[in-house]
């Protein structure tokens, strides 16, 4: 049976490190601070925000919440972002998305200063990921995949890594970050020919297709480490991933669970970015 790569121990280790770094910064008079910008009152946004506030509080990061009415104009939202950009006491900013359809999403993203883009949504942050330059921050979910692999001492240098999914949120940045660790990376998508055969070649398989149960036994072999980024609700109302866990567990060497895997680590990555920005 596979080793289950749970996110909880990774989170605990990251929280401990972030708390120590926060304490050191506060001794210098610096309080790491995150601005959270939310338009409207979607239940999932509110729930996620509560989780962020709790996680930040545990390590000593201050949170400033900017709650805007559902009917706020784009210019009013941009004014808030400009205010955050100009406030030296705010080190990072998280803008809840998706925004209402009337907004120019790209214009809003690019209004944020890359040095405060702790969620990795700006072109500047993407440039940093793809050029390995210290510009902005990687998308949190992509980095969470790497944090799990590093915590569990999964060797990457010289290994074959296959990433299934090419979004700018997970797939492409994860591929670049694996390449930075000297893995040989293949980036696939839903139209890749003979996808199962390519997946079976992987030593490390990262699945971020956004399709429930898309990867099963025909894509897997013994000795693999599988990172499942997907999160869905099945017919029974239970959370599940892009990988059919019941088929993967008896075959592979190690696999992340859903829930309890990548998703649990993402917020700690965000908090770590805020501390980095304050340092």
Feature locations, PLM:
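Short beta-strand elements in bilobed, periplasmic/extracellular small-molecule ligand-binding domains
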Residues: 56-70, 185-187
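Short beta-strand segments enriched in small/hydrophobic residues
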Residues: 31-40
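Glycine-rich phosphate/diphosphate-binding loop of Rossmann-like nucleotide-binding domains
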Residues: 39-54, 127, 136-225, 234, ...
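Anion-binding alpha/beta catalytic cores of soluble intermediary-metabolism enzymes, centered on
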Residues: 92-156
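Rossmann-fold NAD(P)-binding glycine/threonine-rich loop
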Residues: 106-127, 230-279
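Short, well-ordered coil/turn residues at beta-beta hairpins
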Residues: 96, 208-209, 229
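Positively charged, low-complexity intrinsically disordered leader regions
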Residues: 1-30
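Short, well-structured alpha-helical segments in soluble
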Residues: 76-88
């Amino acid at each position: 049976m596979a080793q289950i790569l749970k996110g909880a121990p990774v989170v605990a280790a990251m929280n401990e490190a972030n708390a120590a770094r926060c304490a050191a910064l506060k001794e210098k008079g610096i309080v790491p601070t995150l601005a959270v910008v939310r338009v409207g009152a979607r239940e999932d946004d509110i729930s996620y925000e509560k989780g962020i506030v709790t996680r930040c509080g545990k390590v000593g990061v201050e949170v400033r919440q900017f709650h805007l009415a559902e009917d706020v104009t784009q210019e009013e939202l941009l004014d808030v972002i400009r205010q955050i950009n100009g406030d030296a006491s705010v080190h990072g900013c998280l803008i809840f998305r998706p925004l209402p359809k009337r907004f120019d999403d790209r214009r809003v993203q690019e209004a944020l200063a890359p040095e405060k883009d702790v969620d990795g949504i700006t072109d500047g942050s993407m440039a940093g990921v793809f050029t390995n330059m210290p510009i902005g921050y990687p998308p949190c979910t992509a980095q969470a995949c790497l944090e799990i692999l590093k915590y569990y001492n999964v060797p990457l240098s010289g290994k074959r890594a296959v990433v299934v999914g090419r979004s700018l949120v997970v797939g492409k940045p994860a591929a670049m970050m694996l390449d930075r660790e000297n893995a040989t990376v293949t980036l696939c998508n839903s139209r890749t020919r003979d996808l199962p055969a390519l997946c079976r070649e992987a030593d490390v398989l990262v699945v971020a297709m956004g399709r429930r149960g898309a990867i099963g036994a025909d894509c897997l072999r013994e000795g693999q480490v599988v990172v499942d980024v997907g999160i869905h609700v099945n017919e029974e109302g239970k959370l599940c991933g892009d990988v059919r866990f019941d088929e993967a567990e008896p075959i592979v060497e190690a696999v992340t669970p859903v829930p309890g895997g990548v998703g649990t680590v993402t917020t700690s990555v965000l908090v770590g970015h805020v501390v980095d920005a304050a340092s």
